[in-house]
Amino acid sequence: KEYSYYFQECYPIAISRQRFIDEQVAYKNPSLGYLCLAELISKNKIKNIWTTNFDSLVETATNIIDPQKDMLVCSSANSTSIPNFNPQHPCICKLHGDFRYDTLQNTDEELQALEKAIYEYWKQSMMGRGLVVVGYSGNDNSIMNFIEDNIDDPAFLSKGLYWTVIRDGNVSQRVENLILKAREKGKIAEIVETDGFDDLLYD
């Protein structure tokens, strides 16, 4: 809530918000965690990544580790092409937009709902699979509503939901309620303490 509020206050015009994000994330180098993640992608250990970040660090890291690896990038800019995606290729889906192409979602109003095509693609991709949540607090409705709306489906996240949090940190009541509801539906659901993104992926 604070994030979206101050974003709106400082940059009330959408194009100004997009330019600010562009300045912050363009030409950044991936950290150790991203390089480790890229190695897992290269070895086909991780198939899909769903991110609220606007940057291209995952793509950059993957290109460093495995320049020959084909990776699909999904955002609102190309969501009409989702039916043509080759499921054999790993995919990174920018849930709030890609700073290079999209109208970004970062104010409270913009964070209320996912684009329909992306919503359906994510939903189908989570059938018979699990989800590890890293570096996300659960403070925007679009993502939380998506998980909450589908958690009753036995096939959705049937391999479990693992919500990571910095050691000795806290999760919101909404996240705790989601974990409890997932367990009630017979799913494996855990809050996992970590020492941060880089340490988690390196370990």
Where would I find each of the regions flagged by the language model?
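A charged nuclease-like catalytic/ligand-binding cleft shared by nucleic-acid processing domains
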Residues: 2-27, 72-75, 87-111
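A conditional alpha-helix N-cap/helix-loop micro-motif detector
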Residues: 27-31, 111-115, 140
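SIR2/sirtuin-family catalytic core signature
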Residues: 42-47, 64-71, 80-88, 119-203
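Short beta-strand/turn micro-motifs composed of small residues
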Residues: 51, 96, 165-167
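Short, solvent-exposed loop/turn segments at secondary-structure junctions
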Residues: 55-57, 98-100, 137-139, 168-169
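Gly/serine-rich nucleotide phosphate-binding loop at the start of the catalytic core
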Residues: 1-52, 57-58, 64-67
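Active-site glycine-rich loop that binds ribose-phosphate moieties when present
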Residues: 107-122
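Short acidic (Asp/Glu) patches
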Residues: 30-34, 73-78
